[in-house]
């Protein structure tokens, strides 16, 4: 998907006068490639911690949304300060968006989400709720959780037994709520960046859309 997105982005950027847009997309592509490699390196790593998780997300989803926000205002002729503000905004909501994706992958219903759920577990990818649960578990509980994670990965998306048991534990331990609270905090940090925009319908729509990032169910 990223390859198709960036191919289309480069095609559009080639029609814009000046090279700033192409350079911005190119820089984002390099950052996202590094993020993908970092994620592959840590796939199946039960010791993955929150700082590394956030570094991966910042280099992937957040980098894509940040450059999109910055280029959007750049296309309107906005100066560098406004571009920087929207880039910071995009980076924050990009991380929040990914956190909500993590939550939906564990708690969502396929018919509502619109795609397969529990794909991360089947691929051996640890997401924020799982990472938080592992970090707060007692040693014996952590061992049991790791076995459930291995079973869920072995069962794949079609298997439910281990994934259901793991999901119940993660939810009851408060790790789903924890992940949502992190997303909420990021949105609260992102919203002030929109004050750099002139008051009007565009800013109002962005304020409204920001809430949808973590309230969405698909």
Predicted features, each with a name:
Residues 1-218:
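All-alpha prenyltransferase/terpene-synthase fold signal
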């Amino acid at each position: 998907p990223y390859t198709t997105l960036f191919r289309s982005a480069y095609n559009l950027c080639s029609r814009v006068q000046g090279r700033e847009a192409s350079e911005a997309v190119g820089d984002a592509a390099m950052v996202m490639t590094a993020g993908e490699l970092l994620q592959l390196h840590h796939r199946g790593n039960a010791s993955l911690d929150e700082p590394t998780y956030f570094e991966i997300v910042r280099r992937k989803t957040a980098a894509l949304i940040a450059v999109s926000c910055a280029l959007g205002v750049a296309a309107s002729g906005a100066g560098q300060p406004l571009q920087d503000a929207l880039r910071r905004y995009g980076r924050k909501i990009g991380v929040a968006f990914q956190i909500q994706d993590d939550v939906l992958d564990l708690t969502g219903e396929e018919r509502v989400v619109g795609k397969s759920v529990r794909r991360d577990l089947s691929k051996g990818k640890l997401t924020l709720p799982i990472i938080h649960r592992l970090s707060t578990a007692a040693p014996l509980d952590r061992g049991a959780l790791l076995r459930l994670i291995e079973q869920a990965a072995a069962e794949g998306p079609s298997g439910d037994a281990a994934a259901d048991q793991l999901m119940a534990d993660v939810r009851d331990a408060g790790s789903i709520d924890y992940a949502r609270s992190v997303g909420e905090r990021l949105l609260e940090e992102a919203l002030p960046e929109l004050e750099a925009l002139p008051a009007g319908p565009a800013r109002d729509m962005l304020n409204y859309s920001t809430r949808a990032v973590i309230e969405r169910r698909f």
